Amino acid sequence: RKLAFRYRRVKEIYNTYKNNVGGLLGPAKREAWLQLRAEIEALTDSWLTLALKALTLIHSRTNCVNILVTTTQLIPALAKVLLYGLGVVFPIENIYSATKIGKESCFERIIQRFGRKVV
């Protein structure tokens, strides 16, 4: 029960701040975070902006969804998604952590959920 409550709370926080992670950080950390994101953009030739543009296009299509499979543990992965501003294109239900169960199990779950005819 504790675990179920914890995950419900995590989902609530994720959904509350997926459009406004700055609200979760507070003013001082928000400014540092924005500066860091600007530096990352400059050093990576706007990689994040371009990735977000592609993911937003996919997310806007009615028959398409973005799915994230990571080897990072779930809670740190969700934090990274929020910090990179990707929460708007990755619903929490579509983020899978392969840390404990492995990638193959994650993909089996995705196939069960969405079917085999996925791209």
From Swiss-Prot:
InterPro entries: EYA, EYA_dom_sf
Catalytic activity: O-phospho-L-tyrosyl-[protein] + H2O = L-tyrosyl-[protein] + phosphate; O-phospho-L-seryl-[protein] + H2O = L-seryl-[protein] + phosphate; O-phospho-L-threonyl-[protein] + H2O = L-threonyl-[protein] + phosphate
Protein's name according to its UniProt entry: Protein phosphatase EYA1
Protein task: Functions both as protein phosphatase and as transcriptional coactivator for SIX1, and probably also for other transcription factors of this family. Tyrosine phosphatase that dephosphorylates 'Tyr-142' of histone H2AX (H2AXY142ph) and promotes efficient DNA repair via the recruitment of DNA repair complexes containing MDC1. 'Tyr-142' phosphorylation of histone H2AX plays a central role in DNA repair and acts as a mark that distinguishes between apoptotic and repair responses to genotoxic stress.
One BP annotation, GO: double-strand break repair
MF GO annotations: histone H2AXY142 phosphatase activity; protein serine/threonine phosphatase activity; protein tyrosine phosphatase activity
PANTHER family documented for this protein: EYES ABSENT, EYES ABSENT HOMOLOG 1
Family under the similarity heading: Belongs to the HAD-like hydrolase superfamily. EYA family.
Subcellular location: Cytoplasm; Nucleus
GO cellular component, one term: cytoplasm
Co-factor note (free text): Binds 1 Mg(2+) ion per subunit.
Enzyme Commission code(s) on record: 3.1.3.16, 3.1.3.48
Keyword line: Activator, Chromatin regulator, Cytoplasm, Developmental protein, DNA damage, DNA repair, Hydrolase, Magnesium, Nucleus, Protein phosphatase, Transcription, Transcription regulation
Transmembrane region(s): none
